[in-house]
Amino acid sequence: MAEIYTPSWICNAQINSIDNGWFGKENLFNIQVTLKDGTVSWKTNDKKIKFPKGKNWKDYIADIRFEVTCGEAPYLTSRYGTTTWEYIQIKNRIGFLDRKLRVINENIKKRYYWLKYTEQAFKSIYGYEFHGDSLLLARESLLYTFIENYYEKFLEEPKLEDIQNIANIISWNLWQMDGLKCVIPNSCTDKIRIEQDIFDNTTKINIECQGCKKNNPYLHNGIYCTIMDWEENKTIKFVDMLENKGN
């Protein structure tokens, strides 16, 4: 199956729509533009982001964002154009995480608090992907996003322990999953049951995975995916988060 790449400007337009609703105001981070050659792009708003009454930047950092079938996770971070492969400067990035980090950079100066809220930002974004190669690239992009933003802010590389902490969060929040089954891809199997009659004749009976047979995500015999509930500091099955369980 071929990978489908959503152009970065479409990702930006859709994320802008989400932020327009959250802020109650349009085009706070950037505005869509059409270049002379007909290419659709965006122009970054360089002014500090202002928050509406009743909300603040910490609320924005904590707000959960989730990219399904994320591929290389262009909605989470936009280090490069999805169709051009051109590197995008930090100030012009448009992903969910990019915007959260921008807000942190605008409101935090001290390293300790920057790391604290950056960790929270990483814990607030989620994504799953069927294909392992795309998942690897997505995780890599998120980790590089942390390193690049840290260097941009403090003009030095982050400590290994800080990189490892973010890498651990990424390993939980971006995972490999069959989104229709909520299990690790291709982990469901048919079982063989052998029955023997009184004459010692044996018959092999193939038993299908009931979840696959009945298209019920709660009945699969594959390996169910787990994610981390960071507030409770415990793991939970992703399938248990679905509504109307068992219906």
Feature roles, as predicted:
Residues 70, 188, 209-212:
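Disulfide-bonded cysteines in secreted/extracellular proteins and peptides
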Residues 22-182:
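Conserved S-adenosyl-L-methionine
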Residues 194-247:
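Long, low-complexity, polar/charged, intrinsically disordered or flexibly structured peripheral segments
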Residues 182-198:
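Short, surface-exposed amphipathic charged segments that create phosphate/polyanion-binding patches used
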Residues 1-13, 17-26:
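A short N-terminal interaction module
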Residues 14, 175-180, 214, 219-222:
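C-terminal intrinsically disordered extensions
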Residues 6-7, 131, 237:
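Helix N-cap and loop-to-helix transition residues
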